[in-house]
Amino acid sequence: MNNDEYLTALGQNAKQASYALATLSGQQKSALLRCIADKLTAAKADIVSANQQDVADAKANGLSDAMIDRLLLDETRLMGVISDIDNVIGLTDPVGSEIDSRLLDNGLRLSRRRVPLGVIGVIYEARPNVTVDIAVLALKTGNAVILRGGKETLASNKALCTVIRSAMVSQGLSEDCVQLIDNPDRSLVSGLLKLDKYVDMIVPRGGQNLQRLCAEQATIPVILGGIGICHIYVDAEANLEKAVSVIENAKVQRPTVCNALDTVLIHQSHAKQFIPVLAKHLSGLGVNFYGCDQTQAILTAEGLDVSAATDESFATEWLSLTLGIRVVADLDGAVEHIRQFSSGHSESILTDNIHTASDFMNAIDSAAVYVNASTRFTDGGEFGLGAEVAVSTQKLHARGPMGLEALTTYKWLAWGDYTIRG
């Protein structure tokens, strides 16, 4: 079987499996997800062992610490993933809900009802937890899914999918509801992007190269996002002591994720006072800096290392313990910088002035905009959506963390009495 035949078979099997999934009741889907959680718990030793193989291979191949952190699925992280399944089980199932209903003048009773999308293709890189997150959300909403993870996590993904597929069978469903492309051949990605006869939506979770590839080659609707060049603006009326803890959380808690902070913008009135305090605190936590001219002068005078910031560095999603710092004249300067360099993911303002906060929220056109909060909150679990499929930075169909509703569409239902159009 060549690659085209292989992908066609995957698509056909997924489409066929999706029909039965779409008819499941909420109770049946909850039972399925509970079965998956129980089987993952029972198989945790095998799953962790498979992940250790991936981690060992990654280290042998010289992958970065950031990449290794992304692919790590130890027992603690795995149990967190399983806990998220419980959260999803507890969420309201949007499928079958009525969006609106009205009686038309022509006598038709017209309504819109939420239904599954059908088959979702997800292409992702070194995050094995995504395998479970996506499968669970897809199944909760009655969708079949075709997964294509990175070669770095192949052993982990195989172990996870084997367990999930066994749960499907034990619940009387086709194992083809969840399929994994386990061949690392890159041409299969291009082929999947053109499988529009069977796949209804593509979600790429990865870096700019993957996003660009999908945007350029797909003949299927693509949800773009996941690239997070995130900003925090420290306003003239910010509480500086509290600001340090927010910035630390946004930058240091988990620097390898898309909602981590990349650039902090500081009002000029605080520059000489606040930048040294912030930099000394963060440098003690391993953070290094790229600064504008004024920031460089301030930090150099304090004996702290700093590299010269450029447009290229400000346009970089660091995914590491690196932070850009820029002094701005006012709110307008902060907004101008964000508009130029943001990826449209998450931005925050720290201020005690409610009017300035409101102006910031109105001016910034990103998927998530915060006042006095860390950008790290842009997450399906934190938003009460359960695990997320992705964080969309586009505006059509879905924006921000994609939970259950983002995996549904709707259809029009019209009831008549042998009604004809006049």
From Swiss-Prot:
**Source species, domain of life:** Bacteria
**UniProt GO BP:** L-proline biosynthetic process
Catalyses:
L-glutamate 5-semialdehyde + phosphate + NADP(+) = L-glutamyl 5-phosphate + NADPH + H(+)
Q: Which UniProt keywords apply?
A: Amino-acid biosynthesis, Cytoplasm, NADP, Oxidoreductase, Proline biosynthesis
Enzyme Commission code: 1.2.1.41
InterPro entries in UniProt = Ald_DH/histidinol_DH (IPR016161), Ald_DH_C (IPR016163), Ald_DH_N (IPR016162), Aldehyde_DH_dom (IPR015590), G-glutamylP_reductase_CS (IPR020593), Glu-5-SA_DH (IPR012134), GPR_dom (IPR000965)
PROSITE patterns, sorted:
PROA
Biological role: Catalyzes the NADPH-dependent reduction of L-glutamate 5-phosphate into L-glutamate 5-semialdehyde and phosphate. The product spontaneously undergoes cyclization to form 1-pyrroline-5-carboxylate.
Q: Which NCBIfam families match?
A: PRK00197.1, proA
Q: Quote the protein name from its UniProt record.
A: Gamma-glutamyl phosphate reductase
Taxonomic lineage from the root: Bacteria, Pseudomonadati, Pseudomonadota, Gammaproteobacteria, Alteromonadales
